[in-house]
């Protein structure tokens, strides 16, 4: 199946693996975000890939160009299917992200996040600037 759905695994390691066991890698891909990757590290990618899944590593990298370059290379070295960066990091960071994938036979897809969405999508307009957060 070419257009597989992407299932977010916003869970802890054990529950993520238990959910993955109920899914078919032929019909879906899995998203590993900040919560799961921070708590489980690269092992979660290894475990899910061993089950046959393609992984979208959703960490929205955003830092100085060299740091993002290295982070994107590390993601590619893990063998993820797709990785993202936050586009607000600027053109140099975006170009570094693209360069990081040069030389890979099958590099992950690289996508840019332009705006974060949430149920309250206008929170960035109401941030308190006159007091400590």
Task: Provide a role label for each language-model segment.
Residues 1-57, 61-91, 125:
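Conserved N-terminal beta1-alpha1 strand-loop-helix module at the mouth
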Residues 14, 118-120:
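Short, acidic Gly/Pro/Ser/Thr-rich loop/turn segments
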Residues 123-129:
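Conserved small/polar residues in nucleotide/adenosyl-binding loops
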Residues 109-116:
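Non-cysteine beta-strand/loop elements that form the S-adenosyl-L-methionine
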Residues 68, 95-96, 121-122:
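Short, well-ordered secondary-structure micro-motifs
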Residues 91-106:
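Short amphipathic alpha-helices and their capping/turn segments at secondary-structure boundaries
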Residues 53, 106-108:
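A short helix->loop->beta-strand "cap" motif at the edges of active sites that frequently abuts
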């Amino acid at each position: 199946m070419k257009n597989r759905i992407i299932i977010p695994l916003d869970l802890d390691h054990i529950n993520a693996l238990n959910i993955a066991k109920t899914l078919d890698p032929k019909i879906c891909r899995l998203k590993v975000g900040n919560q799961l990757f921070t708590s489980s590290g690269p092992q979660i990618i290894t475990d899910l890939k061993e089950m046959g899944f393609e992984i979208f590593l959703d960490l929205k990298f955003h830092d100085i160009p060299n740091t993002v370059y290295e982070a994107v290379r590390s993601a590619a070295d893990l063998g993820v299917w797709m990785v993202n960066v936050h586009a607000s990091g600027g053109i140099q960071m975006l170009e570094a992200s693209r360069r990081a994938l040069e030389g890979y036979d099958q590099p992950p897809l690289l996508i840019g996040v332009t705006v974060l969405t949430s149920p309250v999508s206008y929170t960035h307009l109401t941030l308190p600037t006159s007091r400590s957060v």
